[in-house]
Amino acid sequence: MRLALALVILSLVACMVERATAGGVLDRVQSRGSVQCAGFERPGLAAPDRDTGAWRGLEVDICRAVAAAVLGDPDKISFHGYADAADKARQIHGADDVVFLTGTEIQASRLGGRIVPGPAIFIESHALMVPAAAREQHVAEIARNAGICFMSGSPLERSLPAFFDALRQRWRPVPFSEDGEMLDAYNVQRCHAVAGELTALAALRQQRGINNLESRILPEPLLTYPILATTSVQDGEWSAIVAWTVYTLIAADRPAGKWLTGGADAMSAPLAELGMRAGWQARVVKAVGTYRDVFERNLGAKSGLRLPAGLNAAPAAGGALASPVIE
């Protein structure tokens, strides 16, 4: 009986070891010598540098963090943007190691059964931008029947009516099919406000346009939604590595206190069974900084976008990005 039990236990252990060492994606990454990431272009999150063409942004830094975790070098990455049907095929066949997507993008590409919707790396929102001299300080103060510019065919066609219907307030839609035309119309005040993703509005605010118009983004979001670090359903071990890497960056912002562990140790995750070497979390934070560091240099005060952290701050600072912690 004991022998039979021992054989069962050894069999289970062998299965566990086999699973831990299988690591299809990790093996592929280590063989290739780089982590391959992708996402849709968004200012501050993922966009090619105007001078070098190299992709930069918060998503790129998350990719660098994963490379630091599994390869020991944050620069061993490749990043490309998604735009067309060929890119959809790449998603479906798992050609990329980490893909940054919203729920809408997952649904539109019919990827729900093919990817693991991993941790949120950024909470995006739909927002309104008005001239700096406008009287409105809040969205609810937008004048009745005010014209609002937005891109036709975008999710704003749903979020704008839903938001203003909830306020029981009339507004005038001014849709456009080209970004440049919309910006020009706003700059000459053919519409009183412009609606868009928060990151896109921050980039438009920088441009000012032909009339050098200064603008303000109103604080209330029309809609909020996360951008997720997604991975293939075929390799749960890789999904776990990516998730714990993101959580390490978020946990590293936690301040230490009398009863609290701070920094990356707020959620120690050795992950030896997944092939991660000791000290991997410290290497990640050393390579790219904490989540707050990554946010500030790409979207916050140290960037041209100058966005407040808002929901992308830690819960202690009024935000919504949280990681597992040791209570």
Regions found by a protein language model. Name each.
Residues 267-327:
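C-terminal functional modules
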Residues 51, 95, 108-124, 167, ...:
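Ligand-binding "clamshell"
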Residues 4-14:
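Bacterial N-terminal signal peptides
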Residues 38-44, 80-86, 95-108, 132, ...:
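Beta->alpha turn/N-cap motifs
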Residues 69-74, 78-100, 112-116, 162, ...:
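Short helices/loops that flank or line small-molecule/ion binding pockets
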Residues 22-102, 274:
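Extracytoplasmic small-molecule ligand-binding "clamshell" domains
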Residues 60-70, 132-136, 141, 145-155, ...:
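Extended ligand-binding regions for polar small-molecule ligands
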Residues 34-44, 52-70, 124-177, 181:
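Bilobed "Venus flytrap"/periplasmic-binding protein-like clamshell domains
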